[in-house]
Amino acid sequence: MSFVITNPEALTVAATEVRRIRDRAIQSDAQVAPMTTAVRPPAADLVSEKAATFLVEYARKYRQTIAAAAVVLEEFAHALTTGADKYATAEADNIKTFS
């Protein structure tokens, strides 16, 4: 038989920390977005234009990656919170059963 030992409060703290990390990533992305998505060619030649286009596209993909990571982090935080609630409920039910 398998046993699981967990601390619901620790799971709740972890969920809060994951959300803080997500919020910080979103905030950092928002701060740099104007600079990274508005790269202008340093000269009026084809190479400069291609380089600027490449950098803007790279920044766009970065922003998409951050947005996807934020979704994953929120889902993970939600799973931690849900797990903490379920473990806390199970513990409360066990206490009632044996009281």
Curated annotation (Swiss-Prot):
The keyword Secreted applies. InterPro entries: PE-PGRS_N. Its main location: secreted. The keyword Acetylation applies. One of its GO terms (molecular function) is protein heterodimerization activity. Pfam families: PE. Residues 1-92 form the PE domain. GO terms for cellular component: extracellular region. It comes from the Bacteria. Keywords: Acetylation, Secreted, Virulence. It is found in: Secreted. Gene3D superfamilies: HP0062-like domain. The modification N-acetylserine is found at S2. GO terms for biological process: protein heterotrimerization. The PE25/PPE41 dimer induces both a strong humoral and cellular immune response. PE25 protein alone induces low response. The dimer induces necrosis, but not apoptosis, in mouse macrophage cells. It also induces activation and maturation of mouse dendritic cells and drives Th2-biased immune responses. Forms a heterodimer with PPE41. The dimer forms a 1:1:1 heterotrimeric complex with EspG5. Interacts with PPE51. Belongs to the mycobacterial PE family. This is PE-PGRS family protein PE25. It comes from Mycobacterium tuberculosis (strain ATCC 25618 / H37Rv).
